[in-house]
């Protein structure tokens, strides 16, 4: 891979690797809670503390593929820097959601809502990139330069 290609995706790759580490952290919390309450075997049911950790992890795992698709689509089709920043914000919000879910369930609600908004922002970036492609193909007008100018200032 040449240096220019790597430069166009390096931030997205970093955010993806950070998200993998975060998933490992969540899985470790589930494993630790399971061993604390169930001994050496892993079971999906148990005390309320385990149920909360397991459910929070499962909710994060369910949204993970959507996050990855939106992150990479927005970064490749529109602009890498704001997509990577939004991805980092999403990971921060997901951490707050996970920790909030372990306490009172109302503490996880702001993280959930803000996470949905970040996914929507990444979706809008992806749509802008697709729209730009068709504007170039049909009208010869490239709005990506305007987008990159705004995002780099």
From Swiss-Prot:
Segments in the Cytoplasmic topological domain: 31-52, 103-107
Main subcellular localisation: nucleus
Keywords, alphabetical: Endoplasmic reticulum, Leukotriene biosynthesis, Membrane, Nucleus, Transmembrane, Transmembrane helix
Cellular component aspect of the GO annotation: endoplasmic reticulum membrane; nuclear envelope; nuclear membrane
Location(s) in or outside the cell: Nucleus membrane; Endoplasmic reticulum membrane
Pfam family, one: MAPEG
InterPro entries: 5_LipOase_AP (IPR001446), FLAP/GST2/LTC4S_CS (IPR018295), MAPEG (IPR050997), MAPEG-like_dom_sf (IPR023352), Membr-assoc_MAPEG (IPR001129)
Record GO biological process: leukotriene biosynthetic process
Residue ranges, Lumenal side: 1-8, 78-80, 129-153
Intramembrane annotation, residue ranges: 108-115
Entries under PANTHER family matching the protein: ARACHIDONATE 5-LIPOXYGENASE-ACTIVATING PROTEIN, MICROSOMAL GLUTATHIONE S-TRANSFERASE
Similarity comment: family membership: Belongs to the MAPEG family.
Stated role: Required for leukotriene biosynthesis by ALOX5 (5-lipoxygenase). Anchors ALOX5 to the membrane. Binds arachidonic acid, and could play an essential role in the transfer of arachidonic acid to ALOX5. Binds to MK-886, a compound that blocks the biosynthesis of leukotrienes.
Protein name: Arachidonate 5-lipoxygenase-activating protein
Species per Swiss-Prot/TrEMBL record: Ovis aries (Sheep)
């Amino acid at each position: 891979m040449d240096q220019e290609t790597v430069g166009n995706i390096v931030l997205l790759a970093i955010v993806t690797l950070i998200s993998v580490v975060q998933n490992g952290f969540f899985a470790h919390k589930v494993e630790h809670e399971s061993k604390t309450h169930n001994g050496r075997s892993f079971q999906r049911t148990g005390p309320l503390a385990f149920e909360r950790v397991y459910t929070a992890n499962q909710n994060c795992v369910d949204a993970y593929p959507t996050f990855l698709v939106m992150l990479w689509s927005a970064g490749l089709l529109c602009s890498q820097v704001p997509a990577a920043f939004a991805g980092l914000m999403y990971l921060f919000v997901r951490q707050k959601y996970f920790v909030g879910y372990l306490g009172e369930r109302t503490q996880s609600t702001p993280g959930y809502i803000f996470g949905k908004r970040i996914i929507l922002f990444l979706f809008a970036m992806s749509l802008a990139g697709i729209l730009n492609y068709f504007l170039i193909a049909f009208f010869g007008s490239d709005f990506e330069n305007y987008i990159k100018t705004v995002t780099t200032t």
